[in-house]
């Protein structure tokens, strides 16, 4: 009786959250297992009964594990330092796929454990970068919000997953001015973990070195022997606040990037001279948004036209052709996001590789399971 009440409460709770599909899936699992268990009890041969029961239990446990990893929760390893001081290389994070709704598999390679059989098949392996099925996503409990940190696949490859922070939503206009991000003309309040390169003048050297030793950030410091009272380093907002409160530095100046990154590696328009710290304005594509086809828009969005929108757009003498038809405008099929790493000078993000399509979003980071912070 208590078990039935608990199950009913769980199913009702999931329905209230809008997860009808999960409630139905759990109910289907329970009903199927109950029916099979009923027929197993009718078997008179004890050894056969135990064998079949063990096989059924194993298959249900395996199915539950596959279902959970594919649609509910999964574990990922942080591959780089792009999100320091929030995550560190080698950290194991728990990713919640229910937040934005789980993306359904687009090929057998997206299905845990089942994909092992396809990795050993040469014909299937030749199609590992292809989408076998159309993009679909089940209902989630919320939408992506500015400031969310989530895991996504960087391109159509199924081997490379990264984690970044969302600073721009579909339809937003993003502008970066002297390293500060503005969304729709409003300054984005970066979290305390965001790191930037700074120059600063020391007021109290002894206290300064004591503090940076406690913060374990001495390896980030660079000293100028010709100016002994000046130093530079990579600090998070939180670390800078500590240094300022302790009254050991006199002034701070953020290092602004001036064409230190080749233009070919950045988002750009026809006449832009954008840098990592000065860029935009950039309109993030939104599903149904229509743009004029002109040299600036073509240069800014051409990667996603062909790679994610599955539209072949060709420019000939100032005239644009979409799938062979002459057009003057284009309507986007997907929503896109603008992603940035918290380690602003130690990350490759949307400033270089462009916009992230919603179809590549895996799930929101829920927590850190194992941390390498002090290793």
Question: Where are the regions a protein language model picked out?
Answer:
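Extended hydrophobic leader/signal-anchor segments used for secretion and membrane insertion
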Residues: 1-375
């Amino acid at each position: 009786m208590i078990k039935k009440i608990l199950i009913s409460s769980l199913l009702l709770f999931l329905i209230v959250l809008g997860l009808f599909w999960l409630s139905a899936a759990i109910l289907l699992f329970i009903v199927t297992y109950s029916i099979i268990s009923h027929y197993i009890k009718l078997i008179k041969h004890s050894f056969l009964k135990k064998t079949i029961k063990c096989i059924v239990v194993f298959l249900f446990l395996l199915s539950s594990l596959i279902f959970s990893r594919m649609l509910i929760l999964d574990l990922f390893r942080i591959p780089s330092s792009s999100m320091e001081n929030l995550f560190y290389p080698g950290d194991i994070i728990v990713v919640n796929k229910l937040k934005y709704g789980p993306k359904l598999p687009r090929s057998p390679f997206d299905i845990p454990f089942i994909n092992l059989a396809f990795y050993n098949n040469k014909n299937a392996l030749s199609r590992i970068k292809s989408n076998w099925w159309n993009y679909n996503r089940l209902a989630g409990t919320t939408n992506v919000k500015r400031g969310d940190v989530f895991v996504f696949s960087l391109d159509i490859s199924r081997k490379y997953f990264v984690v970044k922070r969302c600073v721009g939503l579909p339809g937003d206009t993003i502008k970066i001015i002297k390293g500060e991000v503005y969304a729709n003309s409003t300054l984005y309040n970066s979290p305390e973990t965001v790191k930037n390169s700074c120059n600063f003048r020391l007021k109290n050297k002894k206290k300064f070195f004591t503090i940076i030793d406690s913060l374990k950030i001495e390896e980030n410091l660079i000293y100028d022997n010709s100016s002994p009272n000046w130093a530079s380093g990579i600090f998070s907002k939180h670390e800078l606040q500590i240094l300022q409160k302790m009254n050991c530095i006199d002034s701070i100046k953020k290092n602004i990037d001036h064409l230190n990154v080749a233009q070919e590696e950045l988002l750009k328009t026809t006449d832009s001279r954008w840098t990592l710290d000065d860029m935009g304005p950039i309109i993030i594509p939104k599903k149904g948004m229509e743009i004029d086809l002109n040299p600036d828009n073509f240069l800014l969005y051409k990667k996603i036209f062909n790679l994610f929108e599955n539209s072949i757009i060709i420019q000939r003498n100032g005239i644009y052709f979409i799938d062979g038809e002459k057009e003057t405008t284009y309507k986007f099929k997907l929503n896109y996001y603008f992603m940035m790493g918290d380690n602003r000078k130690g990350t490759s993000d949307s400033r270089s590789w462009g916009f992230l399509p919603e179809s590549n979003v895996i799930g929101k980071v829920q927590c850190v399971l194992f941390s390498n912070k002090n290793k």
